Amino acid sequence: MVVFDLDDTLYKERDFLTSSFRVIAREAERRGILSYSKAMALLCGSGDGAGAFSTLAREIASRAPGCGMTEEWMVNTYRTHTPDVTLPQESEQLLEALKSKGVRMGLITDGRSNTQRAKIKALGLESFMEPRNILISGETGFDKNNREPFAMMMERNQDEKGFVYVGDNPAKDFVWPNALGWGTVQLDDTEGVNIHPQDMDRPASFLPRLHISSLPQLLAVDLPMI
């Protein structure tokens, strides 16, 4: 069974962030506070999400105090908006190939239930994996720093002979699947755009057993379930 991380593995998390930027910028323009292009320039030129929201909120407060478009409102919009994101071609290529081979797939992801569910729906991932094999920390109560989500996946799929986890973040993606005897594969951030830097200066127990630079490369790996 092949189990995936979601953010910065099956798609780039920056795309979700940019999607929220567009929603916020359109609202600023709709209210006549800032043009869409000006709002997007402020958001995209301010580093990470928190910095971007803070920058735009200050600008809006100076132009339209009390309008309600606060930093808190922007963070909530980021978390709850319907994302305009699509599954990258290489992700779709891999998922379709695994599906055609009859390989069972799953997802273990950290985040709020509504946020992650919105991403999963937008990316069309339900067509590749059973609902019982989509585990979200906001629903299970355990993130990937814990044994539980990986053990839960094994418990739900006792007929599987082996498990592989494909992720991007060595800080938490691989330590527990390694401990449970899974294969572990890191999708390397060759563009340097991931939300979490891939710091490999860690104990061996945290590191993946294999690195790939693109998801379709997984098809060339000698894994018993592929």
Per-region residue spans from a language model:
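Short, acidic loop-to-helix structural element flanking the phosphoryl-transfer center
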Residues: 79-106, 147
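Active-site neighborhood of HAD-like aspartate-dependent phosphohydrolases
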Residues: 1-38
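A metal-dependent, Asp-based hydrolase signature
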Residues: 29, 34, 43-79, 97
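An amphipathic alpha-helix signature
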Residues: 17-26, 50-58, 113, 117
